Amino acid sequence: MADKPKTPKLDATKTHVAKEIKIGTPLISCRFEPKGRFVFAGAQDFHVWRWEPATGKKVQLKGADAWVRAIAFSPDGKTMLTGGFDGRLLWWPVSGDDGDKPARAIDAHHGWIKAVAVSPDGTLIATSGNDRLIKIWNFADGKLVRTLTGHESPVYNIAFHPNGGQLASSDLKCNIFDWEIATGKLARKLKAEEMHSYDKTFKADIGGARSMLFNADGAQLAIGGITKVTNAFAGVGNPAVVMLDWKTGKNLIQHLAKATFRGVAWGIALAPDGMVVAGAGGSSGGQIYFWKPDGKNEFHKLKMKDTCRDLHLAPDLTHFVTAHYDGHLRISKMTAKAKS
């Protein structure tokens, strides 16, 4: 039996943009599908785009008809789920062999679907939205299993625990709820206070988990967003990532930008060695931050050509894709450039 290929050693300080493609309209989300062949992106032209980096081919998928921020996949990589600002949940064939239109569409929420997640075993779908609800759906037939209530503000993000038995949800005020999937029971409430602010001048809340995921063993929950907000109306604040101990709910560390940067950590990734990566964007432009597990401030950062609005780690864990306001998808490798 042949040995499995070794994963190249990562060196964040050598991170470089290796490939990019112009979609041509501002992008708001991006995801690698589980096999790493395609990248999908939600765009402000009301479409979802599929890009195959190996060939450079891009395809505009028909049928979203909305801004799509929420993208998820079945574990086998055959089906993509998207949620848009119109409240519709869509099932798509990933490869395009069965067409480039949704295979199924349901009216899932009143208003914007903020997040979509698929259970580790691929049998359930979770969605959350501006209607303050979380809904659990049967993956196979799209039927509603149950609705989870309790949040008092829009539910920005959700994540299934790797054990498949729990679901984490976080709202605008960064209240974090731990749900039992089998019963729908709310097991406990946590909070990441640093990721929420109230602007007395504009009488507005700002914050929430703009990105959220568990690490591989489920011991920690990473939450990306904005902190130290000085103007809620203009969204002026600094990007941050909070790491919570999932068992105790304790805030382990808050990763911050060393220098002033006005923006939000829209997308985050966790490397196998615990390194935290965040794609930040705002009025200061676009920046990729790299933190060591115990580092308050980044040990490296990479300036991007334009505002970064999402980031997702590739299945091989050596590179990531970012979506940008200038309409480009960019793939960056966390290894040294190959010698020519």
Give residue spans per PLM region.
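WD40-repeat beta-propeller superdomains and closely related acidic/aromatic-rich repeat-like regions
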Residues: M1-S340
